[in-house]
Structure formats: C-alpha cells, structure tokens
C-alpha cells in the first residue's frame, strides 16, 4: 500500500482535551461501588449451596467484568464445583457451563461428559436455545482430537442459526447473535461487559445490585482509560513534532484500544501505557520497513536497533534518525516510570524490537528475491515474530507487578509453544484479513499466497485453508493453556487475551489499518459512559 493511502486519525486531539469528573463526583461513584461490591460478595458466598446457582453467578460476574473483584471467592467455589458430583449430569446447560468454567480456570475436565447427550446414531439430542448456547461456548475450549467438541460446534451452529428464524425473547436473541459472531471464550472481556450489561438488564432474573455495580465498575474504569489516552496521545503528538513522519498510520487511540482489550483491569494502567507506546513504535517500524523505506535504508535501521546506542543514528537518513532517537528516549522513559527495582525490564523491550527487525529484514530479502517459502510452517517460523503479537504481549508484562519475574521474561524470549501459538494465530488472522491489499501493494508474500502457489488454489480457497490452520492454532493454545507450568497463570491468561484481540481486530478486515470499522466500539469503550438508570 502506498503510505499516503493510510487514512488520517479519526480522533485527532479528542482525548488531549479530556477533563475528568470532579473529585466529589468520582468519590461518590467509588463509594457506591464499594458498598455494592460487599453486597455482591455476600450473594457469591450464599451461592455455594447449589452448584447451578454458583455457576450462573460466576459466569454472570465474568461477563459483566466484575470477576477480578472476587478472584479468591470464585477460585474457591470452582474448586468445590470440580470436586463435587452434586449436580444434574443430565442437564446439558449445567454440564456445558461447568465444563466451560472449569477449563477456563485450568481444571482438566474430560469432553466425554458430552457423549451422553447423543443418540444411538451419534447425533446430539437438544433443541433448547439456552442449552445450545451453553454447549456451543463450551465446545470452543476444544483441543486436538476432541471429536465430540468439533461435532458439537457444527451441530449447535446449525441449530442456533435456525433458531433465529423463530421469535425469541429479546435478551436471548441478542445472545444468539453475539455468540454466532464470536464464541464467548474468544470475546474481548471489556467489550463483553459493554455488550452484556444491556442484555443482563433485560433478564427477568437479574440481580439489581450486580447490574448497578457492573455499570459503575465500567464507568470508573473508563475514567482511568481516558486519563491514559490523554498521556499517550500527548506522547504521540510529541513524536510527530520531533520526527514529522507523515507517511505512517496515525493510530494511537486504536493502539490503546487494543491494549485495553487485552489488559482491562484498573491495576494494569502502567502496563497499558507502556504496551500502547510499544505498539505505536512497532507500527512505525512496520510502515517504514514494509512500505516506505528502500531496502538499504531498512537494513541500516535494523543495524541501528541491533546496536541500540545514540551514535548509531549517524548511520540513518534524516527521517529515520529522528525516529530512532525518539525510540531510544521512549524506552529510557519507560525505565524511569518502572522505578529502580523494575527498570531492568526495559532490556526485554529492546530485545523484542531486535527480534522484530530481524524478522522484517528476512521478509524484505524474500520480497527482493521473489522467494516464496516452501511451506506455511517455514513461513510462520520467520513471519510469526514480525506480526508484533509477541512483542506487544511481552511489553504488557513489563508494566505489571512483581509476579512477573526476570525468569518469566527469560522464558518468554525462548519462544515457548504458548507464545508460538499466539504468533501463529495473529499472523494467520492478519494475512487472511489483509492479503488482497498487501498483494496488490507488492508487499511480501503472505501465508495465503504461500498456500496458493504451493497447491494451485484460488485466493478464496487458500483463505479457507488458512482459517482451518487458525483453528488448529487455537486448539494448540487451549492445550497449552490447560498444561500446568512453573510460571504465573497470569502469563497464559494474558497471552490468550492477546489472541482474542487479534481475532477481534482481524475478524472481517484489518480493523487496525482501516480503523473506521472499529470506531463505534472505541467510542463505547472510551467516550460513552453507561447510564445508571
């Protein structure tokens, strides 16, 4: 793509002008939320007497974005659910929800629990819409070889699509539409809260305290996000003043949206800010090396990043020199924000960028030599690191607490299989969404073109195959997510969250490059508070 074809920012200085509510108003919101939290905590403790009630309450809190307030209580409840057989194993809704929540929290539960819901010919026997939704969502926690879950997805999707032809209760119809668009486990958690709050508000059995808390919780989080957006937008504006890079994608708000989609809890504010800056810097590097610079200039930039010292800027043409110096200054400022005990983590930010430009350099060589990787596996080995998912996910850990140790970062730099599954998902989704645009622009060969050339297929056929490979990568991720390791579970959870963001951003098109496609959802997340009445 000609760099001049990138549309300008849709937000401009909107968030620079952000003014937070008065301290008394914010204090009142916080005080009310704290009262409601304790009321809901009592409800959660009372639910331990009945497994179905406990499961319903846990999934409700998760979908409304409230579960982080009750991590200990939920973990204790699910341990009880896991060890107890006191539930109706003939109730598909309960069995599916139990399976979903236990797997989500790392408990090994066999998918054989679903075989009893099939008839003698192997067909599922269920026509209740609520049960279908529960089974469909549970089945997406599948790993390789779980044929019963593959069959469950195919069956329930057909049934749910057919159910929309009949009149459904409004809340249930909304649920079906949402689920067919994206199964529950793959949805961005903060966007799920935005979408589910009005659905929950329509439910006859809703808990008013939970509903009010969900609204207040979101509105308070939104205030934090807007403060962060003001900070990163000012940083981005300063980059533009010092570098005048008119050819790049101006997407700082979209970068922060992406990071918030993966790390939405209030306590990860520094994580979001650092990761947003890293994502923006990666975007600049990508636009420089992929669409604007000559091969010689791109290689000089890569060499300067390998050296990581101010005098390396003398290697570079003017437009790169200013950016390079701003890059170094930004990473140094991240060290200042982290403080003396965590500033060592900026070393890993530098290493991640070196990995990125090393892969980009390889892709440029392929492009210049008209080389097409012989297999998609070969392609992913080199192109996985250049999609940026590894760098962005790891940069989010830099701003997190002491639970993320030096050993954690060293492990991440070895490319464990969980990280590889993230890179593969992001690369395959990105290529499927952007292959036509990038092929027309003469950029490097994508996994889609690689498959087309190897197998002699059409682009549409190749895209379908790449979608199948994406599902295989999700199965890899689920398997690895369920495998215990010595590293904090937060790492695996965050990596899965970043896979969800890739699924959202590239579901229909390249939502990051063509950001008008996600503008309405950005407004819901950052601009429009939820009415309390």
From Swiss-Prot:
Annotated binding of Mg(2+) 2, by residue: 286, 290
Enzyme Commission no: 4.2.3.47
Keywords: Cytoplasm, Lyase, Magnesium, Manganese, Metal-binding, Plant defense
UniProt function note: Sesquiterpene cyclase catalyzing the production of beta-farnesene and alpha-bergamotene in equal amounts from farnesyl diphosphate. Involved in indirect defense by producing volatile signals attracting natural enemies of herbivores.
Biological source species: Zea mays subsp. huehuetenangensis
Pathway(s) it belongs to: Secondary metabolite biosynthesis; terpenoid biosynthesis
This protein's domain notes: The Asp-Asp-Xaa-Xaa-Asp/Glu (DDXXD/E) motif is important for the catalytic activity, presumably through binding to Mg(2+).
GO biological process terms, semicolon-separated: defense response; diterpenoid biosynthetic process
Primary localization: cytoplasm
Protein family membership: Belongs to the terpene synthase family.
Protein name as catalogued: (E)-beta-farnesene synthase
Residues that coordinate or bind Mg(2+) 3: 430, 434, 438
Cofactor: Mg(2+); Co(2+); Mn(2+)
Gene Ontology CC: cytoplasm
Pfam families on file: Terpene_synth (PF01397), Terpene_synth_C (PF03936)
Catalytic activity: (2E,6E)-farnesyl diphosphate = (E)-beta-farnesene + diphosphate
């Amino acid at each position: 793509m000609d760099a001049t074809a990138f549309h300008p920012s849709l937000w401009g200085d909107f968030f620079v002008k952000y003014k937070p509510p008065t301290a008394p108003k914010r204090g009142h919101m916080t005080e009310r939320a704290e009262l409601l939290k304790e009321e809901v905590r009592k409800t959660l403790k009372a639910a331990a007497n009945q497994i179905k009630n406990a499961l319903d309450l846990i999934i409700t809190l998760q979908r409304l974005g409230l579960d982080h307030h009750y991590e200990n209580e939920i973990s204790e409840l699910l341990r009880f659910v896991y060890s107890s057989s006191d539930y109706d194993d003939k109730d598909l809704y309960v069995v599916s929800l139990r399976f979903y929540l236990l797997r989500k929290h790392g408990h090994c539960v066999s998918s054989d629990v679903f075989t009893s819901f099939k008839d003698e010919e192997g067909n599922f026997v269920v026509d209740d819409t609520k049960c279908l939704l529960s089974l469909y969502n549970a089945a997406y926690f599948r790993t390789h070889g779980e044929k019963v879950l593959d069959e469950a997805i195919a069956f329930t999707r057909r049934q749910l699509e057919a159910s929309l032809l009949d009149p459904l209760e409004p809340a249930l119809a909304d649920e079906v539409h949402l689920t067919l668009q994206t199964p529950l486990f793959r949805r961005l958690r903060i966007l799920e809260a935005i979408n589910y709050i009005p659905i929950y508000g329509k439910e006859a059995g809703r808990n008013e305290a939970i509903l009010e808390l969900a609204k207040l919780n979101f509105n308070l989080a939104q205030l934090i996000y807007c403060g962060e957006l003001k900070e990163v937008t000012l940083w981005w504006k300063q980059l533009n003043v010092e570098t005048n890079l008119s050819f790049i994608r101006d997407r700082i708000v979209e970068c922060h949206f992406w990071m918030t989609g993966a790390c939405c809890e209030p306590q990860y504010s520094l994580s979001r800010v650092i990761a947003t800056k890293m994502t923006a810097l990666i975007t600049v590097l990508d636009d420089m090396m992929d669409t604007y610079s000559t091969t010689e200039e791109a290689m000089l930039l890569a060499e300067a990043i390998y050296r990581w010292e101010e005098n390396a800027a003398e290697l570079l043409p003017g437009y790169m020199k200013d950016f390079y110096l701003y890059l170094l200054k930004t990473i140094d400022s991240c060290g200042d924000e982290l403080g003396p005990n965590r500033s060592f983590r900026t070393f890993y930010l530098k290493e991640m960028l070196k990995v990125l430009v090393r892969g980009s350099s390889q892709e440029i060589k392929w492009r210049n030599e008209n080389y097409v990787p012989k297999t998609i596996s070969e392609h992913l080995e080199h192109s996985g690191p250049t999609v940026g998912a590894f760098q962005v996910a790891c940069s989010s850990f830099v701003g997190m607490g002491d639970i993320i140790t030096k050993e954690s970062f060293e492990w991440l730099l070895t490319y464990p299989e969980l990280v590889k599954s993230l890179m593969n998902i992001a690369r395959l989704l990105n290529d499927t969404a952007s292959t036509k645009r990038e092929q027309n622009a003469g950029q490097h060969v994508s996994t889609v073109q690689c498959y087309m050339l190897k197998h002699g297929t059409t682009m549409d056929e190749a895209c379908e195959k790449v979608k199948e490979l994406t599902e295989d990568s999700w199965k890899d991720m689920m398997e690895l997510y369920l495998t215990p390791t010595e590293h904090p579970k937060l790492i695996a959870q965050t990596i899965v969250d970043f896979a969800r963001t890739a699924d959202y951003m590239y579901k229909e098109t390249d939502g990051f490059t063509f950001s008008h496609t996600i503008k309405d959802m950005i407004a819901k997340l950052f601009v429009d508070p939820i009415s309390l009445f």
